[in-house]
Amino acid sequence: MTVSHNHSTKISQQPISSVSAFKFFGKKLLSSSHGNKLKKKASLPPDFHSTSTNDSESSSPKLPNSLKTSRRANSFAHTTNSKRSLSSASTKILPPAGSSTSISRGNRHSSTSRNLSNSKFSSERLVYNPYGVSTPSTSLSSVSTSMKKDPDLGFYLHDGDSKIRMLPIPIVDPNEYLPDEMKEASIQLSDNFVFDDENKTIGWGGSCEVRKIRSKYRKKDVFALKKLNMIYNETPEKFYKRCSKEFIIAKQLSHHVHITNTFLLVKVPTTVYTTRGWGFVMELGLRDLFAMIQKSGWRSVALAEKFCIFKQVACGVKFCHDQGIAHRDLKPENVLLSPDGVCKLTDFGISDWYHTDPHDLSSPVKKCAGMIGSPPYAPPEVMFYDSKKHYDTELQQPYDPRALDCYGLGIILMTLVNNVIPFLESCSFDTGFRDYCDAYENFIRLHDRAFRNRGNYRPGPGMEYHLARNFKNGHASRVAWRLADPEAATRYTIDDLFEDPWFQGIETCVDANDKYVCKKPIIKTTTYENPRGFHIATDVAATTPTSNPFLKNRVPIRSMVDIAAHPSPTATVLASSPPPPPPATHVPAEALFTLRETPPPQLATLTLSEEPPATPAPSAPSAPSARVRGHSPHRVVHHHLNIVNSLVHSSSAASSQVPAST
């Protein structure tokens, strides 16, 4: 108790900084009962005294090697535990109990400050390091500094995921990879579009992400931007070829009622939400088919509506095959529903021309080899190429890509009716698929030995079979099972499907022969300088719709350079420019995958929007229908669609989605 009294008296005689230190360590002093511990607890940190370093060096004694080692270890402690490390360091430098060596309080703390100032942290200069990636290693780190490498810029642009690669600057002009009839006057996204205020990702996949964009000139016009990313160890040239091929196929298949329209291939700049690259400006869908099937209310949807959706998807597939293109990745995620209930195919990332000569539709069929598509909807002949299954190479035979699409149609029909996918993989390792194959053979052996023969329209499996129980119609189950035939040689083709009497009798909500009127984006700003003296405000006035009478006859504001070059606002040199070449029927094969070394030629014409489709002849729908307000009179809605729309609008606010390629 005497030691405690004397010590407290000495502390009270210290300057104000020592008194504040006493308050800081007050709880420790009151809780201590041992004299030696009390003496150690009263040591102050170096921040509360002002003794010079030179004086402390002259008065501080030499310490044993063991104490030096412990002091050096404490100097490398983390900065967040600085108080604890200082306390332990000052405790370790005290002489043992009963020692005759006396160390003054000032010298003791100045020695601690000197030792810490000689540490590695104190001797180095401060470096601006906001991300903390250049911090040198300490005794707490198990990896040496020489083994660490600073990440590149992509590390920060992708939230630390350095595996995602970015295209080098400058981004290549998309017109260098497009045929002449598909070249664009505007290749910059920022020329005519802005990102939606929500800035949400509405779709994503392994090679892309989808966001909403709006027109600069009409905010209510909303479109989808499919931002494409590099995959695996893809080189920039392979990336450009892959994306341009997908755009050419999607553009070729546009203008059909059951195909999602693709408008532009543009360059996307680096923003807060996206990285630089290429992107598609596409029609925005309301919801994909998979999101509707997984809702609990889908079970109550009538079979007539499900069959209507199936027929719309089949019409889209048939149109692709008629154009010489195989989709090769059919699944509910790649089927979009428009606001008026029309089903549309999307995502042509792995689609391809299935003729040896894409220009000649009568040329032989080009077969495929390798693992393509999604396992639940890929046929058995494709699953033989799965490296994880280790199938015998003799089973890996080239296959017709059209048969792959037909098999996917059969699985989609089963999924629509049964509300779940029938099995996970179409291979012998999946128990569900093995049961399906056994049931298939049992039905042929016990009920209909001619089930696989062409032209046989007898009823298919009934209630006794698990995957045919919910069809409640033998003819409907026949179509589903014939499309999903495990044997590719006897599987239904797209022509066999459209010749089936049951399929022909399905009532649909839209006629596939009708022209779908889709709102196209307004293009006012061009990327290139037009060589024919194009004046944007003058030429666009006749094609830009407006309801404001004050804007119709408004004289545009012109710069002095424009006035000097063209004194008359309507002066053009159309006579000197050659007429544009007629559009080609097919895409030149050499233009699809050839990189031009010269810059793109100046565009002679400006495409403000695609040519409006010809007005089709009125055709009566094949089922009771209702007109859609504000749309073409030929666009009708099925009488069962109100159930589907109730499922769509019951979702969350982020209901618009365009599936991305996987």
Curated annotation (Swiss-Prot):
Protein name: Serine/threonine-protein kinase PTK1/STK1
Gene from which the chain derives: PTK1
This protein's GO CC annotations: cytoplasm; nucleus
Keyword entries, A-Z: ATP-binding, Kinase, Nucleotide-binding, Serine/threonine-protein kinase, Transferase
MF-aspect GO terms: ATP binding; protein kinase activity; protein serine kinase activity; protein serine/threonine kinase activity
Domain Protein kinase span(s) in chain numbering: 196-503
Gene3D superfamilies assigned: Transferase(Phosphotransferase) domain 1
InterPro entries according to UniProt: Kinase-like_dom_sf, Prot_kinase_dom, Ser/Thr_kinase_AS
Keyword Kinase among UniProt keywords: yes
EC annotation from Swiss-Prot or TrEMBL: 2.7.11.1
Nucleotide-binding recorded as keyword: yes
Protein family (similarity comment): Belongs to the protein kinase superfamily. Ser/Thr protein kinase family.
Residue spans of biased composition, Polar residues class: 61-91, 98-119
Residue ranges, compositional bias (Low complexity): 50-60
Catalytic activity: L-seryl-[protein] + ATP = O-phospho-L-seryl-[protein] + ADP + H(+); L-threonyl-[protein] + ATP = O-phospho-L-threonyl-[protein] + ADP + H(+)
Region ranges (Disordered): 35-119, 605-631
Organism: Saccharomyces cerevisiae (strain ATCC 204508 / S288c)
Class of this enzyme: transferase
Residues noted as binding ATP in the record, renumbered to the chain: I202, G203, W204, G205, G206, S207, C208, E209, V210, K226
GO biological process, one term: G2/M transition of mitotic cell cycle
Catalytic residues in the record: D329 (proton acceptor)
